[in-house]
C-alpha cells in the first residue's frame, strides 16, 4: 500500500487555504489497515442482526443472493444515503463490512462505469447475474450530508459474484448503527464541529486516500473530470 493521506487534508478548513492539497475529482477514501478495507451497506433488522451474530450476510433468508448489492467505502456517503439509519426500515442497520485488499481490488478490476443510482433499474438488477461489477462516482458528502465538489465511489456487486463475496470475501461484519445515530444527534446540537473533533469523539472513522495501480485507475476512469 502506498503512502496514504488522512481525509482531514480534504475536509478541514485550515487558516491558510494555499497550503491545502486539492482533492482529485475522483478518489477513493476509506478506513483500512494493512490487511483489510471497510465498506458500508444498510440493511433491515431481519438481515443485519443475524448477519452480525453469525458473521454471514446471508444468515437470514431475507438476504437475496439474486440481487445486486451496493457497497461504499465512504462513511459520510453512507450516512447521507441511509439518513443516518432513519431513512426507512430497509436501511435501519448500518453494517461495516471488512474485505481483504486483494478481493476489493479484484472487484474493482471487473468494474464498468455507470452514471448514478437512477440508472440502476430493476431490469438491470435482474440482469446482474451475468453483469460486471458496476461502479458509479457520486458527489461526496460532509458528515452533515452537505454536497462536496468531488466524487465518492459506490460499488455494485452483481448476483454472479454475490455468493462468493458473502461466503469468501467478507471477513468481518460490525453493526455501526449506534455510531450513526450518535453522529446525527451530535450534529443536530452543534453543526460547527470539525472532522478532527468528530474523529476524536469516535463518531466518524478516520479515512485515508486508498491508492490504486494505474491500471485500476484507468478501469475506474479516475482521471476523468466529469
Regions of interest found by a model, annotated:
Residues 135-137, 142-149, 155:
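Internal, well-ordered alpha/beta segment that forms a basic, Gly-enriched binding/recognition surface
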Residues 31, 35-38, 130-134, 150-152, ...:
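Non-catalytic, substrate/partner-engaging modules appended to enzymatic cores
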Residues 41-43, 100, 138-140, 156-160:
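Structured loops at beta-to-helix junctions and adjacent beta-edge loops in soluble globular domains
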Residues 166-226:
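Glycine-rich, aromatic-bearing surface loops/beta-hairpins
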Residues 4-65:
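ADP-ribose/NAD+-binding catalytic cleft of ART/PARP-like enzymes
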Amino acid at each position: 500500500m502506498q503512502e496514504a493521506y488522512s481525509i482531514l487534508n480534504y475536509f478541514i478548513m485550515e487558516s491558510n487555504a494555499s497550503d491545502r492539497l486539492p482533492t482529485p475529482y475522483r478518489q477513493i477514501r476509506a478506513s483500512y489497515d494493512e490487511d483489510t478495507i471497510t465498506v458500508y451497506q444498510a440493511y433491515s433488522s431481519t438481515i443485519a442482526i443475524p448477519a452480525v451474530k453469525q458473521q454471514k450476510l446471508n444468515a437470514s433468508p431475507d438476504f437475496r443472493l439474486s440481487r445486486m448489492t451496493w457497497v461504499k467505502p465512504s462513511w459520510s456517503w453512507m450516512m447521507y444515503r441511509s439518513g443516518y439509519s432513519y431513512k426507512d426500515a430497509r436501511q435501519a442497520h448500518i453494517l461495516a463490512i471488512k474485505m481483504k485488499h486483494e478481493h476489493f481490488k479484484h472487484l474493482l478490476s471487473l468494474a464498468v462505469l455507470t452514471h448514478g443510482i437512477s440508472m440502476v433499474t430493476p431490469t438491470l438488477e435482474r440482469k446482474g447475474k451475468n453483469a460486471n461489477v458496476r461502479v458509479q462516482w457520486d458527489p461526496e458528502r460532509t458528515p452533515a450530508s452537505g454536497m462536496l465538489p468531488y466524487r465518492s465511489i459506490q460499488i455494485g456487486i452483481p448476483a454472479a459474484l454475490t455468493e462468493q463475496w458473502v461466503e469468501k470475501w467478507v471477513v468481518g461484519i460490525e453493526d455501526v448503527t449506534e455510531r450513526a445515530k450518535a453522529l446525527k444527534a451530535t450534529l443536530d446540537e452543534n453543526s460547527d464541529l470539525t472532522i478532527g473533533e468528530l474523529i476524536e469523539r469516535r463518531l466518524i472513522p478516520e479515512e485515508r486516500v486508498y491508492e490504486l495501480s494505474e491500471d485500476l485507475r484507468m478501469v475506474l476512469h479516475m482521471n476523468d473530470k466529469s
